[in-house]
């Protein structure tokens, strides 16, 4: 049975992905891995909202998703960003299909808190059949984080949560959070494998700080019964060299050495 990797690419790193990154994806495809991509698009959404002069408000650091904001987000996520990624994969000889969580009932959600956050969903159910159909044909699904309710309302969902849900539904062997750093660093050296307990200690000690904390917390929350290994890797360089993944691996517990 083929192994599966899900990549989560944040909106801030998508346009900075290196040629080495795409070459590595190609190598993995050629060596028999199934691949799916979930992407964000925050910076591009903000830019488009400004261009269209759509007013926004923030609640607890999160942009409230009003109907006009949602329409803009869907336009950017399913349109500009999604097709940009598909095109970059095509340039590297890889077949990809751009979809969103609405397609084929992939991500089914309910309102997180409509009064507070607006059109934002919490994923309740996944149906990965559309992903399996694409993978069977050797096509990489590139997924925008949008979902649908049981009443067919469109909701925006957190891209990290979407990636975690997709990885869980696929029983993925690896979920890779693609960032602009080599992994979790302690000074100049990269920490290769960490458990949740070790990560908390590093946060308490200030080794993990600033913008790295939300990246690490996203990776931690993705660990589940169905996703046993999460990695933080660098999209600005090679993440797969000498037949090994380069980055920080986050596991529930380390294997005991007997």
Curated annotation (Swiss-Prot):
> So, what pathway does this thing act in?
Amino-acid biosynthesis; L-arginine biosynthesis; N(2)-acetyl-L-ornithine from L-glutamate: step 2/4
**EC number(s) given by UniProt:** 2.7.2.8
Which key words are in the record? Amino-acid biosynthesis, Arginine biosynthesis, ATP-binding, Cytoplasm, Kinase, Nucleotide-binding, Transferase
Annotated Gene Ontology MF terms? acetylglutamate kinase activity; ATP binding
Any one cellular-component term (Gene Ontology)? cytoplasm
Q: Which CDD domains match?
A: AAK_NAGK-like
Keyword set includes Transmembrane: no
Q: Where in the cell is it found?
A: Cytoplasm
Where does this protein hold substrate? 41-42, 63, 156
The residues annotated as site (Transition state stabilizer) are 8, 215
- The main enzyme category here is transferase
The GO annotation for biological process reads: arginine biosynthetic process via ornithine; L-arginine biosynthetic process
Main localization, broad class: cytoplasm
Instruction: Answer yes or no on keyword Acyltransferase.
Output: no
Which InterPro entries does the protein's record reference? AceGlu_kinase-like_sf, AcgluKinase_fam, ArgB, Asp/Glu/Uridylate_kinase, Glu/AcGlu_kinase
The record's similarity note reads:
Belongs to the acetylglutamate kinase family. ArgB subfamily.
Function (record text): Catalyzes the ATP-dependent phosphorylation of N-acetyl-L-glutamate.
Quote the protein name from its UniProt record: Acetylglutamate kinase
Native organism is: Bacillus velezensis (strain DSM 23117 / BGSC 10A6 / LMG 26770 / FZB42) (Bacillus amyloliquefaciens subsp. plantarum)
**Name of encoding gene:** argB
